[in-house]
Amino acid sequence: MKILYSQRRFYPVETLFNGTLALGGRDQETTGFAWWAGNARLINLSGKLLGAHVAHAGLIVFWAGAMNLFEVAHFVPEKPMYEQGLILLPHLATLGWGVGPGGEIVDTFPYFVSGVLHLISSAVLGFGGIYHALIGPETLEESFPFFGYVWKDKNKMTTILGIHLILLGAGAFLLVFKALYFGGIYDTWAPGGGDVRKITNLTLSPGVIFGYLLKSPFGGEGWIVSVDNLEDIIGGHVWLGSICIFGGIWHILTKPFAWARRALVWSGEAYLSYSLGAIAVFGFIACCFVWFNNTAYPSEFYGPTGPEASQAQAFTFLVRDQRLGANVGSAQGPTGLGKYIMRSPTGEIIFGGETMRFWDLRAPWLEPLRGPNGLDLSKLKKDIQPWQERRSAEYMTHAPLGSLNSVGGVATEINAVNYVSPRSWLATSHFVLGFFFFVGHLWHAGRARAAAAGFEKGIDRDFEPVLSMTPLN
């Protein structure tokens, strides 16, 4: 096997770990990687790499279960979910577990069950990881050819890709089945302020589903992030699941075409870079989804979006001043535009003031007050319901702003509470992690391409200053 990395040593490197960690075939001499390079030592040891991955899955699932139970233990049903620093329970509530009308949490037992199931699963994965890391065969090719592989084997690699795609498609269909048959999911748009319902009228029209992909990403359009009904979301998962499953079958049954064999780099590090690039894209999309979309991420659980909190403030003061006798249709603001409502350049009636930039917000508490041409002045005067006032006042004081020390909300707002929105956390974490994954993609892609081109030798050590120094010993 061609070693791609320089293994010359000019002076013996003595570390605490040198003697003890020279496990069979996993030391620096054999692999070109020191102990701290982690799984890089296992690139050609499929059995041990399996152990590392299964153990890692165990850690992930253990975190999910433990954090889930931690959130259940701290949960207070009387307070909104988004005021309690929760990031897992909102996802379970969105799936329709334990939720009643208006997003009220009526039963936390399903959340407890979820946590326990994840803990039990993590124990199984942890055992499997330790078994394969310490006891199982170093390589799988000889004993279990179905599970064995060589990174350069293009046909085997696309078969593995196909299996992964089928599993992803099955995951998409799990959401579809939950929404259609197993109790339904939470719909923030259900009449009267949100409820759990089964989705009966799926959107399967390719024109609608793929139309989202063709939309502009900018205001008023919003690409796929603009989806605002569960029918389209679940229909999209039917399409996505089907494409993944059929694509997976295709990749299992076929061999890569000549152009693909020539165009791609076929090595373990190249596959790592492709995966990191894909996950980075998913992270950036998830960031935009959780920040802007209040259908997939209902405001009842995640708190209002930024535009939603801003429009809620305009609405709250419109309600207050209208009660005090202001004529909200004609009152002028300091700029000469409408103080409470104004016309957009294209003629729709929108909220006035600073929130005009969020004119394209859609939210369940606001939509009933719209007419054919934006906000309806007569509805604003006669039809505002108490639940709309309550919800907008609540959202106004829970804007998704805040810092790490939890001094949340608008800094100058005297009614703000000490709070950081889960939207802030989830959007920021996915952006930051997406960025790190993107850097990892560039790093590993560069190394993989250099290795494939034959000039990856690590740092050139011929002229290192240390070579002219006296040996330490």
UniProtKB/Swiss-Prot annotation:
Name by which UniProt lists this protein: Photosystem II CP43 reaction center protein
One BP term from GO: photosynthetic electron transport in photosystem II
Organism listed in the record: Marchantia polymorpha
Membrane topology, from the record: Multi-pass membrane protein
Residues with N-acetylthreonine modification: T15
Assembly notes: PSII is composed of 1 copy each of membrane proteins PsbA, PsbB, PsbC, PsbD, PsbE, PsbF, PsbH, PsbI, PsbJ, PsbK, PsbL, PsbM, PsbT, PsbX, PsbY, PsbZ, Psb30/Ycf12, at least 3 peripheral proteins of the oxygen-evolving complex and a large number of cofactors. It forms dimeric complexes.
InterPro entries given in the database record: PS_antenna-like (IPR000932), PS_II_antenna-like_sf (IPR036001), PSII_PsbC (IPR005869), PSII_PsbC_sf (IPR044900)
Gene: psbC
Residues bearing PTM Phosphothreonine: T15
Residues of the propeptide: 1-14
